[in-house]
Amino acid sequence: MKFISWNVNGLLACVGKDFENQFKELDADFFCLQETKMQEGQLDLQFEGYESYWNYAEKKGYSGTAIYTKHKPLNVSYGMGVEEHDHEGRIITLEYDQFYLVTCYTPNSQTELKRLDYRMTWEDDFRKLLKSLDAKKPVVICGDLNVAHEEIDIKNPKTNRRNAGFTDEEREKMTVLLNDGFTDSFRYLHPDEVTYSWWSYRFKAREKNAGWRIDYFLVSDRIKEQITEAKIHTEIMGSDHCPVEVDLMF
């Protein structure tokens, strides 16, 4: 099964940049989107053979997630069931016979780390959700997790040490999550590869490949040997992020 995750940084804008053709060419079983910035009824974008599920932020033009799938789920849930976290459309969970699929758009800690304390609370609560799912069946987690985990995952680690997405605190939360029974699929197959998934729109960052790897597929440790492919599609434009992929044998 082929899974794609992409922070589209505004789906309306991305649709204007060849999104529909890219979607069809990737031909995924599951296509997860973050930062859709959509409101309900704003865009009717359907693809033959796919069902879609949407979680919208209450604030207009902000955040939001979606999943297109060729496989009808047993159950769908939105958010993590914690009032504090469930106003920004950041999580969708699909349940299947053999696994859960969770797509997530993790809150950015923002300039001057204004939201870092909130981010720490989010991380702990999100980890609890994933562990509760993992106790029932394996979990596939994808999305913009807004952290470059190790120095290999960011072009300029030293100058970004206290910037949102590369603080010691955020990186440690990712370490704790992985140690609790999850595998970073890309690093599992490509332990030494330097590839990024996000580039600032400023300073010609993408042209210079001054990027960050902040988009992930994590899987429960017990299915890591079912990973057959893990890719970062740096060739695909349309957003400041590029799509990431994992292929799993189920």
Where are the regions that the model predicts?
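Surface-exposed cleft-lining segments at the edges of enzyme active sites
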Residues: 81-82, 107-123, 158-162
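Active-site beta-strand termini and strand-to-loop segments that position acidic
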Residues: 70, 94-97, 220-221, 246-250
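Active-site beta-strand/loop signature of hydrolases that rely on acidic residues for catalysis
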Residues: 7, 23-41, 101, 130-151, ...
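Structured beta-strand-rich core segments of catalytic domains in phosphoester-bond hydrolases
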Residues: 37, 42-109
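Metal-dependent phosphoesterases centered on the DNase I-like endonuclease/exonuclease/phosphatase
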Residues: 51, 125-210, 214
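Active-site-proximal beta-strand elements of phosphoester/diester hydrolases
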Residues: 1-9, 98-110, 142
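N-terminal, active-site-proximal structural segment of metallo-dependent hydrolase catalytic domains
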Residues: 1-47, 51, 57-63, 78, ...
